[in-house]
Amino acid sequence: ILFEGNEITQDDVLRREMRQFEGAWASDDKIEQSRVRLERLGFFKEVNVETVPVPGTDDQIDIKFRVEEETTGNVGGNLGYSDFGLMVGFNLQERNFLGTGNSVGIAINKSIYQEVYNLSFYDPYYTIDGASRGYSLYYRATDYGEFNIANYTSDSQGLGIQFGYPISDTQRIGLNLTYDKTDIDAGTLPVRDILDFLIEEGNSFSTVSAQ
């Protein structure tokens, strides 16, 4: 099995999608299934396949997959204005990081009252049999004084871990685990209700969830 046209994407990324195996009896159905799986990756504009007889033999063939790669990265930004001031944002997503088939994402959003940072990573083949694993991190700082609600701030951090396992060519089961932690700072002149709440409940809150 040969691959042509994948200048960025590594051969291993294509080979793990094969349902026709080298050294096995050739099957038109498995060859076509392999081609369709390459298309589903979303890394290629076009995927073609041909079978070529091996010179000097009458019972062997080479299978050649020709791919045309397409852009897998996206860069975006946003700019807005509300009653609370200017809002700006930036995001970067690469679905085929360094040709590994892994996905990496970064997002930053800032305004006068809030800053949010997100980072994500996803490996669709964490194990050889197609189990996937992903991570996501975030940090959010909010100044509620800018809302004219109350003069306090909060800092939140979170970690997410995602696992997936294929149960068919088109279906997967998954498990998402998340941990969130929020710290509240009442400031130098806190509102009495907020101060009473923090004295009773504390100023740090953590949650763990699974779904």
Across the structure, where does each feature detected by a protein language model lie?
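N-terminal periplasmic "start-of-domain" segments of outer-membrane beta-barrel proteins
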Residues: 8-22
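Gram-negative/organellar outer-membrane beta-barrel architecture
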Residues: 8, 24-211
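Generic structural signal for individual residues within well-ordered alpha-helical segments
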Residues: 2, 15, 32-35
